C-alpha cells in the first residue's frame, strides 16, 4: 500500500478491495497503512473460509497495531520473517535444527563421543566466527564488504525507519527522535536484563514513555526479548526479560563494534554479550521450522545464572552457557551443574557453546556436559538414531 491509489482504495472501500482477487490469492504489502482492513477481512473471511486467500506483508504486524479492531483470531496465522540464518547463508542442503540434533546426541547409546556426531570439517576460523556474529543476517548489507559501504546501508536503513516508519506507526515525531538513541543504548549492552529505570534515565524520559518506545521498536521487529525463566521451579528467580537489538549486524553498527575492536578490552566484553544475542537469534530462527516445539528464556537467582534455557513442550530443558573464549574448563559449567542437580530428570541436555573448534563431552560428578563450537548451531549433521 505504498501506492497512493491502492491505499486510498483500501481505505475507502475495504470490502471491495479485498474481493478484487476473486478466487486467487491477494498479496497486500505494507498492509499496516490501512488498519481498517482487519475488520473488513474478518467479514470477508467469515463468508468464505477457504485458507490462503490473503497474504499480508509489512514492516510491522497489522494485527498488533493500536486501534486495529479485530485480531482475526482463528482466521489468520502470523509468521515473522527473520534475517537469514547461518544455515541459509551457507546454502545448507537441509534446514539446521540444533535443538533436535542435540536431543538425538544425548539420547544416543551407541556413540562414544560427541565428535562422532559433529562435522569437524570447515570449522570457521576464530576471526571468521567473530565476523559472522558482527555481520548479522540482513541480506542486503551482507552483499557489501565490511566497512563504509556496509555502514552506509545500516545508517540509511535506520534513518528511514526513524523518520518515516516510526512516525507513521506512532503518529508522533517524538518516537523518531528517541528511536535511534534507544537502539544505541540497547546495542551497547548486547543481550542484557532490561532495567527500565536506568534506560529511561539515560534517555532523559519517563519509564512510561520508554515502555511506549520499546513497544514500537518491538512492533517494528527491531528489538527482541527473552523472558526470565523459573515458573514451576523457584519463586526466587529474576523475572526481568533480557532484551537486545534483533539483528547483531545492526547492534554492531550502532555500538561501533568491529572484529578488531572485539579483540580488545571493552570490545571483548561487548562481543561476549553480542554472541549470546546471536545464539538466541539463531535458535529463534530455527524455532520457526524445528521438529521440536520449544521456548527460549534465561535464568538468574542470587549468584546463579544460566544464559539460555530452552524449554521443550514436554517440560524438559536444555541449559546453555555461552563463552566468548577459545578454551573452557570446569568453571564454565559450574552453574549448569548446580541448577541441573536441582532440576534432575527435567534436564535434557547441558551445553557450553564457545568459540573453540572442538566438540567435546565431559562427565563431571554424574553430569554430562557438551562443549560445542558456536558453528555447531548450523554445521551439525543430520540426527541419527542411537
Regions of interest found by a model, annotated:
Residues 62-78, 90-95:
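Short regulatory helix/loop adjacent to the ATP-binding pocket of P-loop NTPases
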Residues 83-103:
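Conserved small helical "lid"/interfacial subdomain of P-loop NTPases
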Residues 96-261, 265-274, 281, 296:
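Interdomain hinge/linker elements that couple catalytic modules in large macromolecular machines
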Residues 38-56, 60-62, 70:
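Conserved catalytic/switch belt of AAA+ P-loop NTPases
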